[in-house]
């Protein structure tokens, strides 16, 4: 992605991303989005990665995949701290590649969702846990 508008907006984007990363804690997620591949006339699946920090800004980053290498473009090499994310293996591989500089924290919304899914097979037990998580 490039062009005149992108060139003008890049310093603003980088400032927002720097601010989000400055706190040593960031929430990261990737969302699949179908996009029209230029010159092909067909749609493909890409990913809109988000980085956010409570009571701070949010930034968005576009990638055509959700590979571990994409996180190098989302998380600056200078970042140290905690990344809150889902259980997708790319986050673990990314953190392991950075040594001891990154700690992963799970996402309660994803944990809670799994208990809702388990309600069909074990409604009494699985139904109790979402209420406990909500109290947190």
Feature-to-residue mapping (PLM):
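Catalytic center-proximal scaffold of phosphoryl-transfer enzymes
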Residues: 1-136
């Amino acid at each position: 992605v490039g062009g005149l508008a992108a060139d003008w907006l890049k310093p603003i984007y980088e400032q927002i991303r720097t601010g989000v990363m400055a706190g040593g804690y960031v929430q990261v997620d990737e969302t699949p989005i179908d996009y029209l591949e230029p010159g092909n006339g067909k749609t493909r699946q890409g990913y809109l990665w988000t980085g956010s920090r409570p009571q701070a800004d949010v930034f968005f980053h576009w990638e055509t995949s959700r590979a571990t290498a994409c996180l190098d473009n989302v998380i600056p090499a200078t970042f140290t701290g905690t990344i809150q994310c889902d259980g997708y293996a790319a986050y673990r591989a990314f953190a392991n590649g950075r040594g001891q500089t990154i700690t992963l924290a799970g996402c309660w919304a994803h944990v809670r969702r799994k208990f809702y899914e388990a309600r069909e097979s074990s409604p009494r037990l699985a139904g109790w846990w979402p209420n406990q998580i909500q109290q947190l």
